[in-house]
Amino acid sequence: MKTLSCGILVLSILFGSVTSAQQFKSDVSKKGTTAASFLSISQGARAAAMGSAFVAVADDWSAMYWNPAGIATTPNGVTFDHTQWFADIGYNFVAGSVNLGSIGAIGMSLTSSTIGDMKVTTVNAPDGTGEVFNMSQVAFSVAYAIQLTDNFAIGFNPKFVYERIWKMSANAMAIDMGVKYRTPFDGIVLGMSISNFGQKMRMTGQNAVVLYDADPASSANNGRVPAEMSTGDWALPLNFRVGLAYQPSLGDMHRLVLAVDAMHPSDDYESVNVGGEYTFDGFLSFRGGYKALFLKESEESFSLGFGIRQQIMGHLSLSADYCYVNFGRLNDIQKISVSMGF
C-alpha cells in the first residue's frame, strides 16, 4: 500500500509538472514552435517498429529515451541505433547502462546528427557565395534508475542539449523522468514519463553581430558600431507519455507484448501509439505498430520491423533490429540497431 501511494505521488508530480508547463488551447497545435526538434525522433529500431508505444515496455537500453525507469531492470549492455531521416539527414543514438544491484542502475546516452554541407546563399547570390555551412545537433545524458520494490521503479535522465547552424549555436539543460509499475493484474505494466523538461534555447554567435548606425541622417557619427541582434528564446519539445504494456503467459517458446501509449506534447496535438511484438524462442522477433492515431494531418503512420538475438556465451548476447516507418508523402524512414548485452 505504501508503494502504491508513493507511485501515485510521483505520477501526480510528473503530470502536474507537464500540464502546468503546457497551457495551450486544444485547437492550436503549436507545431514548429520548439527548438531541438530532433529530441522528438524515436530512438531504437525495436521501439519504433512497435509504433513508438514503448513507455511501459522500456526494457532495453533505448529506455533512456522512452522511460529512464526501464534501465533499473535492464541487464548490462550497449546499443547503437542509426536513423536515415529525410533529405539525407542521419541521426545516431548510442546508449548503455550498468546495473549496480540494490543501489540502482546508471546509464549514458548520446544522440547526434549527420548533416552534409550546404551552400551559403544570399539575395544577391541565390546560387551560392562560394561558402558552405553545416549544422549539428547533440544531446548527451546520464541516467539513474532504481527499483524501489519488486513492482515499482523510478528513473531520472539529466541531459545537455546543443544545436549549431553555421556560426550560431544554442544549448540547454533538461531532464527526463519516468516510472514503471507492475500492476496486480497479471502481465500488465503501467509506464509514465516526461521528456525534455528544462531550459529554453537561444541562438547566439557571430552571425548575429552587425555594424549599426544609430543616426544614419548624420555624417558626424560613427556609422559602424558593432552590435548584436537579439534572438528569441525557444522551449524544448516537452512531452508527457502514459502507457500500458501487456504480456500474456505463452510458455517458454513464445513471447507476445502488446502496448499502447497516449502522448501529450507541447508542440502538437495529443495522439495515441499502438504496437506489438512477437518473439519465437528468444531468437526471432516480428513487430508492428501505428503511430499518431487521432493526430490531425499526420504523415507518420504504420511501422514494421524484425530482429534477431543470439546468446553467445554466459551473459553475452548480440542482437540486431530493423525498422521501417511509413511517412506518407514524405520519404519513408529506416532504422537499424545493433546491441550487445553482457
Describe each PLM feature range.
Residues Q22-A48, G90-F342:
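Outer-membrane beta-barrel porins/channels
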Residues S62-I71:
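N-terminal periplasmic accessory domains that precede
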Residues S52-F54, G77-W85, C323-V325:
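Short strand-turn segments of transmembrane beta-barrel domains in outer membranes
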Residues G16-Q22:
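Bacterial Sec-dependent signal peptides at the C-terminal "C-region" and cleavage site
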Residues M1-G7:
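Positively charged n-region of N-terminal signal peptides that target proteins for export
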